[in-house]
């Protein structure tokens, strides 16, 4: 065996971390970064620098490198590709040995892949576009507490998307009035109602009071309709201890589902809460508050498809995904891609939808995709077509803004949904024939008729900021 000798000093990253001859192993974690280097920094050096700074490297050689097997543990930049329509940026593909990461810890994965390297001076912009988690790593993660099929069985709801509503105004209601709003929505035909992401335990409505009034409303609506109902009780809290306290109380009063803001609340807290939900038979709804700060800039940050994968590993039964047709950012092809990443067992590479790697989830359960944000009854045909059955279609203002009140808004959405599902099952093109389908259903539903009249001119036709790079070709 050759004796390794230490040579002090600074050398180019490419000498150690650029390996175009490398063939990734099935057990490697693979990452695709979009890199915009500083002027004068060539592609190979920039890619190697990212590989180094996100794995074992530092700015100079160190003698302690001789105490370990650097050839095994280092990240390897193994491929570079052009970014369509962008001469300044390029894609760098980097392979990391699985042993660089703690088992079952999305926190540890992110600390390396999106840690200090994102402040590296050699690059002007850096975006994590996609990650391939090998099955060997997937199996170390807890994943969704229950998954799609178990939730359908718990709630006894099959053959259609689920219907939800975020209670508005999002802040300022008393617990009693909040519970009243929940009751009207659930008795009108919705499956779920929801705390808004920024409802925690404020002076106008403390969490315990809200939980009690909401659970009473839920049970009353169940008794009157004969259907299972639920309300996403947000247990996000200042400390993990307080979060678990709220979750335990929700379980004690019989709530079937709780909620967590997984980015603002933190990945450690989310992973722990998902495990608690699995152990205690409680469903877990996940909100993505703060995601756009991280994922909306097309040249720097983390793409939402990565945040989607991280959530599936960390754990959640629902995740907000955007709507395509509503008020929030969301390119259609990209959205369809990350919806599949949430729900399917195996997703092949598909650049047309922004998916850079095959992803095998093995037996890990899927996650309901939640469409929420600026949607109303006129969007129903498109939503059913885009999201399919394993989704939650969540109408906030599109329920509570009905001229006749919450129950009428809920009834309008339920009639519209069932009309679209029936038409789809008959083989009709529900997006093209949506107006005719809804108009026919409205003949038997005055609530739907009024809703259609109220929102017929409401559209959100702004251009998408974060487009697929393939669209620039």
Curated annotation (Swiss-Prot):
Q: How does it assemble?
A: Heterohexadecamer of 8 large chains and 8 small chains. Forms a CsoS2-CsoS1-RuBisCO complex. The N-terminus (residues 1-136) interacts with shell proteins CsoS1A, CsoS1B and CsoS1C. Holo-RuBisCO interacts with the N-terminal repeats of CsoS2; binding is sensitive to ionic strength. A fusion of a single N-terminal repeat to the C-terminus of the large subunit of RuBisCO (cbbL) shows the repeat can lie between a CbbL dimer, making minor contacts to CbbS; thus each RuBisCO holoenzyme could bind 8 repeats.
- Effects seen without this gene: Does not grow in air, grows poorly in air supplemented with 5% CO(2), a high-CO(2) requiring phenotype (hcr), has apolar effect on expression of downstream cbbS. Expresses type II but not type I RuBisCO, does not form carboxysomes but instead smaller, empty cytoplasmic inclusions. A double ccbL-ccbS deletion is hcr and forms empty but otherwise normal appearing carboxysomes. Required for growth in ambient air.
Catalysed reactions, semicolon-separated: 2 (2R)-3-phosphoglycerate + 2 H(+) = D-ribulose 1,5-bisphosphate + CO2 + H2O; D-ribulose 1,5-bisphosphate + O2 = 2-phosphoglycolate + (2R)-3-phosphoglycerate + 2 H(+)
Q: A cellular component term (GO) from this record?
A: carboxysome
Q: What is the effect of changing residue 72 to A?
A: No longer binds N-repeats in CsoS2A
What are the recorded Gene Ontology BP terms? reductive pentose-phosphate cycle
The protein depicted here goes by the name Ribulose bisphosphate carboxylase large chain
Task: Tell me the function of this protein.
Answer: RuBisCO catalyzes two reactions: the carboxylation of D-ribulose 1,5-bisphosphate, the primary event in carbon dioxide fixation, as well as the oxidative fragmentation of the pentose substrate. Both reactions occur simultaneously and in competition at the same active site. There are estimated to be 270 RuBisCO heterohexadecamers per carboxysome. Alpha-carboxysomes are able to assemble in the absence of RuBisCO, unlike beta-carboxysomes. The RuBisCO large subunit is required for enzyme integration into carboxysomes; replacing it with the carboxysomally targeted gene (Tcr_0838, AC Q31HD9) of H.crungenus places RuBisCO in the carboxysome, while the non-carboxysomal large subunit of H.crungenus (Tcr_0427, AC Q31IK0) is not incorporated in the carboxysome.
